[in-house]
């Protein structure tokens, strides 16, 4: 069940450091669906859909990221996107 969908844009050293794959791992562990994809401006866009507490847990992790990353900002907004059935990398 998807209580909530949230879209996040993560800024910093987040491309080429395993950020999307680590985000997928965190999301799947939390039971959250969505996607993570690189943007041309160097950010990563993340869609998270799931129980509110699980989405919040992954958002908190986005501020940390995997060891090779350096997150400087995470911007979030509620999303109206239809919830996907899995977590995809783009």
Swiss-Prot record:
Pfam families: Acylphosphatase
Acylphosphatase-like domain: residues covered: 5-90
Annotated EC: 3.6.1.7
Top class in the EC scheme: hydrolase
Catalysis performed (reactions): an acyl phosphate + H2O = a carboxylate + phosphate + H(+)
Catalytic residues (positions): 20, 38
Entry-linked InterPro entries: Acylphosphatase, Acylphosphatase-like_dom, Acylphosphatase-like_dom_sf, Acylphosphatase_CS
Keyword Hydrolase attached: yes
Gene Ontology terms, MF aspect: acylphosphatase activity
Top-level taxonomic group: Bacteria
Keywords from the UniProt entry: Hydrolase
Family statement drawn from the similarity comment of this UniProt entry: Belongs to the acylphosphatase family.
Protein name: Acylphosphatase
Protein's organism: Chromohalobacter salexigens (strain ATCC BAA-138 / DSM 3043 / CIP 106854 / NCIMB 13768 / 1H11)
């Amino acid at each position: 069940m998807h209580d909530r969908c949230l879209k996040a844009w993560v800024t910093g050293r987040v491309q080429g450091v395993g950020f999307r794959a680590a985000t997928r791992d965190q999301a799947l562990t939390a039971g959250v669906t969505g996607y993570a994809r690189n943007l041309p401006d160097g950010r990563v866009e993340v869609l998270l859909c799931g129980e509110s507490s699980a989405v919040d847990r992954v958002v908190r992790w986005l501020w940390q990221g995997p060891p090779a990353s350096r997150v400087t900002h995470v911007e979030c907004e509620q999303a109206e996107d239809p919830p996907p059935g899995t977590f995809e990398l783009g």
